[in-house]
């Protein structure tokens, strides 16, 4: 592992309430689960943890409530090699919550309550201007207020900080924001929401990537689940396959991929090698239960890759 540029992650923090069950309930149906746990999550926090554990020099801009779960989350993040000084504690607010069902195939459905995450305002972003401006990269998702994502992207763009956006949860985005993004990592659903193109195969992945290139994004990585990633740089695309593993829980697969990917890119790994590194991290994560508890450390990722040679 080589020295890397600094990373700022801006995003959400949640307490995940996870129920494992054989199949998802249909409307009006009650289903008995076989395992329940509360774990720390939130797309921002998951990606920050993935970056911290995989070796990034990282600071995290986020908000928690002034409750006991918020204090516990902050303590845990600090043990994951994350600078938590930009994490704000919002007085009188609760830490964000996610309710998660995981079925027998490891698939999940998630509902969230923003809580303190909604307080991540443009003013709080502005207070971190210098940190963003001096970073090598800024990684964001869409569980934070869009105006704050936009504010951070503008600061980064003005200061030549790489802007990486994982556009999740899926939603339409203004062209003004997309024009500020250097790297975007949608899954198939998110890519369709952004481009209007259903990503059914590599041909349609290439078409969706081209739409995003035309909006000003140089590097488009469309994650395809078990089929890997469609990677396109300025219109030159290829599919980079992932690793075959027995999935137990896919809750943090995408977040682990994103955090590990940006870490590898900041270490100046070539894009295909960085994707392979991120694939390895995600492959380990899906063999474990929970969001942050599933995220691997750097030595685990390196050992996994060594076994693939």
Label each residue range with its predicted role.
Residues 1-63, 68-79, 246-248:
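Glycine-rich phosphate/adenosyl-contacting loop at the front of the ribokinase-like
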Residues 1-7, 171-176, 202-309:
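Conserved phosphate-binding/catalytic region of the ribokinase-like
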Residues 10, 35, 61-66, 85-95, ...:
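Beta-strand->loop->alpha-helix junctions that form or flank phosphate-binding loops
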Residues 81, 118-123, 163-170:
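Short gly/ser/thr-rich secondary-structure transition/capping motifs
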Residues 85-90, 100-137, 142:
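Conserved phosphate-binding/catalytic loop of the ribokinase/pfkB sugar-kinase fold
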Residues 128, 137-207, 226-229:
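Conserved beta-alpha-beta core of the PfkB/ribokinase-like small-molecule kinase fold
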